[in-house]
């Protein structure tokens, strides 16, 4: 974006402000954006662009944030990969970890954690409730590092049935971790949940 990729120092002031203010950073694909990197590849064919942009742009962003050292230099930055499903995440993490021993010392000596450790500390990847791969993905990246996206008001959205679909498709324990994971992505803690419970009880 703005001719600067996500690991560029250009974005450091914005990352720092997000950390300081405790504000979540979210990635969303850019299939309709005039600056989309998919347009030079697929032109005006929206089918091509819609399929490719959701996973490819998310993967490009995660590679930049992990390998490019954004999470190393901004350790308190919380990042959500949103409205693009998430079954791509385990495979990409495995690929980064495969290359990590060969390239870290020569190309990314600033990294002090493994790729999976950065993901576990800084990342959440969203589901939309009806994907067949949710439970398998949760087993690979952790249900607590997942969240849900309603994808409203897009034409392929499951809104308003996202949470309902999630509860139908995975065991309740996994669904609970995913729902709480989303709350943690946006900085809510157990103390916030207790305050909400107390407020709701007071209204009753």
What are the residue ranges of the model-derived segments?
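Mid-to-C-terminal alpha-helical segments outside catalytic/metal-binding sites
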Residues: 68-69, 77, 88, 124, ...
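Alpha-helix-centered segments that form part of catalytic cores
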Residues: 116-126
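Short His-Asn-centered micro-motif
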Residues: 82-83, 125-128
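Histidine/acidic residue-rich metal-binding segments in metalloenzymes
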Residues: 2-118, 133-144
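A short, flexible beta-alpha/helix-coil linker loop
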Residues: 1-2, 162
């Amino acid at each position: 974006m703005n001719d600067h990729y996500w690991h560029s120092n250009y974005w450091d002031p914005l990352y720092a402000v997000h950390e300081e203010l405790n504000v979540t950073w979210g990635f969303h694909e850019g299939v309709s954006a005039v600056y989309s990197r998919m347009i030079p590849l697929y032109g005006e064919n929206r089918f091509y662009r819609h399929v490719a942009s959701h996973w490819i742009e998310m993967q490009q962003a995660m590679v930049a944030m992990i390998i490019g050292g954004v999470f190393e230099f901004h350790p308190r930055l919380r990042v959500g990969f949103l409205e693009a499903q998430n079954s791509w995440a385990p495979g990409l993490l495995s690929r980064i970890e495969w290359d990590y021993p060969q390239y870290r010392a020569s190309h990314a000596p600033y990294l002090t954690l493994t790729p999976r450790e950065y993901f576990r500390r800084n990342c959440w990847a969203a589901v939309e409730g009806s994907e067949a791969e949710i439970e398998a993905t949760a087993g690979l990246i952790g249900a607590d590092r997942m969240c849900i996206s309603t994808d409203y008001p897009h034409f392929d959205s499951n809104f308003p049935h996202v949470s309902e679909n999630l509860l139908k498709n995975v065991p309740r324990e996994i669904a609970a971790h995913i729902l709480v994971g989303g709350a943690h992505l946006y900085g809510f803690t157990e103390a916030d949940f207790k305050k909400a419970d107390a407020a709701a009880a007071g209204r009753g």
